[in-house]
Amino acid sequence: MKSINIVECKNEDDLKEVAILAEKIWHEFFPGIISEAQIDYMVEQFQSFDAMQDQVKHQQYHYHKVYEGDELVGYIGLQNQPDCLFLSKLYLKDSARGKHYASEMFEYAKKQAEKYCYPSIYLTCNKYNKHSLAVYEKFGFQWIDSVQTDIGNDFIMDDHILEYRLNRI
């Protein structure tokens, strides 16, 4: 069974690679869940190089590249918050899905949460993204709330909020 290697982004070139991959992944995965116009808008607002650079510099985000061999196949975006770790982004290209890489990526996120002594990890996921919701539930996340967020340009993010409690003694 193949495995992945996860590497923290250290510079602008790393973030640029992630942003290019993000646009590809979003256009592979989200049609049928949200409109193409909303995909384009959300990529520009939240997944572009400029957005990621701002998140790293001003919002305590850190990004991690996911490799299968030498190929960049995914990325993770984490945000340090006062009381928990926010799993903002966990994405894989279509060719890397179904190989249990998401579970390896989640284990990596758990280690990051433990490193910062967080009691929990939370995330938001589109209510109509049934596959990802099922994966997160399998990982042990629990639904704690729902939220509709106006993100501008007449678009709404219609999400479930999920939480994973770390076993801490």
Language model region names:
Residues P119-Y122, N126-L133, E137-F139, S146-I169:
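C-terminal "cap" of GNAT-fold acetyltransferases
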Residues A96-H100, G152:
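Glycine-rich phosphate-binding loop
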Residues G98, E107, A134:
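Substrate-recognition "cap/lid" segment bordering the active-site pocket of phosphatases
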Residues M1-S3:
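Basic/polar N-terminal segments that are highly enriched at the extreme N-terminus
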